[in-house]
């Protein structure tokens, strides 16, 4: 029955969904970029942040039926540069073509324990943690849970993802921690919690909710974010664990959270079943600038691939996490055509 219900919802979502057009300056090219989005508010807000770091104009199309969306895509006539269509397999059957990409909404990564500080950034975090004498403690009392929720977790999510963010409810968090299968680990400086993270105690423990007090820059500069990875790793090592799930990340390879986890030798281990179709609609310089600036992970035949985009003038140098099936490099020719330049497997 649950599968039938999910299928009905998927079909309904594929037939009719919210639509927007975002337009603004693409910073790499300095030219106007117009993006069509079909899906939910959270993904729309994500694309707005990724495509337009400054600001953009948002045009609501209201609820759009599948046939209307198809008409918009076919009749864009160069007025649109790019489309993102959120959904699952029904959406892919309706809208995805051979030249399109399918991006999972999230990927998850794991790291071996103990954590090895092999990168320059990881070593710098450890140095700053020692400099500021950061420490940690496990707490499960109501005042600590409420302080973490209102002053650490919630402000961090809102600052990063905006007012339409999904925020776990306080009662749900309290029940999880008080039940014993979730641990609240707080990062302290001078006797005050400046950051924290919730650890889900599964066979491969997972970092769940975390943040920095009031999302303050001064605490981040103390390596408070790094501490929410290092101290849980040390605690779990003491408990006999050999791996830690670093939690979910967005699939754009320049995403700060994903890049940070890569510092600790993250390996991508899983992905969401649902995602977004990325559909190039033009060969404009603004589209080329966006793709070169925001390479991403996509799904094909059950495997995850990094997709890097280059121009004749510039080669992509973004770091690619371990755990993917391979890396694909694409080149934009002078006339704006996208050509696959190279594909390498993870074993090469």
Model-derived regions, located:
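Conserved donor-binding loop and adjoining core beta-sheet/short helix segment
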Residues: 1-101, 105-111, 188-218
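Active-site/acyl-donor-binding loops of N-acyltransferases
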Residues: 3-13, 17-27, 40-42, 98-116, ...
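Well-ordered, non-membrane alpha-helical segments in soluble/globular domains
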Residues: 61-70, 118-123, 224-231
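Short amphipathic alpha-helical segments and helix-helix/interface helices
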Residues: 70-74, 126, 173-174, 233, ...
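Short helix-terminating capping/connector loops at secondary-structure junctions
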Residues: 77, 178-180, 240
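A structural signal for short, well-ordered beta-strand segments and their strand-loop junctions
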Residues: 81-87, 137-138, 186, 243-247
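A conserved beta-strand-loop-helix scaffold within acyl/acetyltransferase catalytic domains
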Residues: 92-220, 234, 251, 343-344
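Aromatic (often tryptophan-rich) hydrophobic motifs at membrane interfaces
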Residues: 183-286
């Amino acid at each position: 029955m649950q599968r039938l219900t999910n299928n009905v919802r998927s079909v309904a979502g594929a037939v009719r969904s919210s639509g927007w057009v975002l337009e603004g300056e693409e910073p790499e090219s300095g030219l106007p970029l117009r993006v069509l989005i079909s899906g939910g508010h959270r993904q729309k807000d994500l694309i707005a942040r990724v495509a337009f770091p400054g600001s953009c104009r948002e045009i609501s199309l209201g609820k759009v039926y599948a046939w209307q969306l198809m008409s918009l895509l076919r009749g864009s006539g160069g007025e649109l540069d790019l489309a993102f269509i959120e959904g699952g397999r029904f959406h892919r059957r309706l809208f995805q073509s051979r030249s399109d990409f399918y991006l999972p909404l999230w990927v998850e990564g794991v790291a071996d324990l103990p954590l090895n500080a092999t990168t320059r950034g990881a070593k710098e975090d450890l140095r700053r943690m020692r400099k500021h004498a950061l420490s940690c403690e496990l707490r499960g009392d109501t005042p600590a849970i409420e302080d973490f929720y209102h002053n650490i977790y919630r402000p961090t999510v809102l600052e990063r993802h905006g007012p339409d963010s999904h925020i776990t409810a306080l009662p749900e968090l309290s029940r999880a921690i008080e039940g014993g299968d979730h641990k609240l680990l707080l990062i302290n400086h001078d006797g005050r919690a400046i950051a924290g993270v919730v650890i889900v105690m599964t066979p491969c423990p997972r970092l769940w909710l975390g943040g920095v007090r009031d999302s303050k820059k001064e605490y981040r500069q103390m390596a408070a974010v790094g501490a929410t990875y290092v101290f849980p790793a040390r605690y779990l090592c003491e408990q006999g664990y050999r791996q830690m799930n670093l939690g979910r990340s967005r699939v754009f390879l320049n995403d700060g959270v994903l890049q940070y986890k890569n510092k600790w030798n993250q390996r991508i281990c899983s992905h969401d079943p649902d995602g977004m179709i990325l559909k190039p609609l033009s060969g404009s310089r603004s589209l080329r600038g966006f793709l070169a600036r925001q390479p991403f992970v996509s799904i094909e035949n059950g495997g995850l691939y990094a997709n890097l985009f280059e121009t004749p003038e510039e080669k992509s140098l973004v770091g690619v996490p371990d755990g993917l099936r391979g890396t694909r490099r694409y080149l934009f020719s002078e006339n704006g055509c996208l050509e696959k330049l190279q594909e390498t497997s993870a074993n090469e």
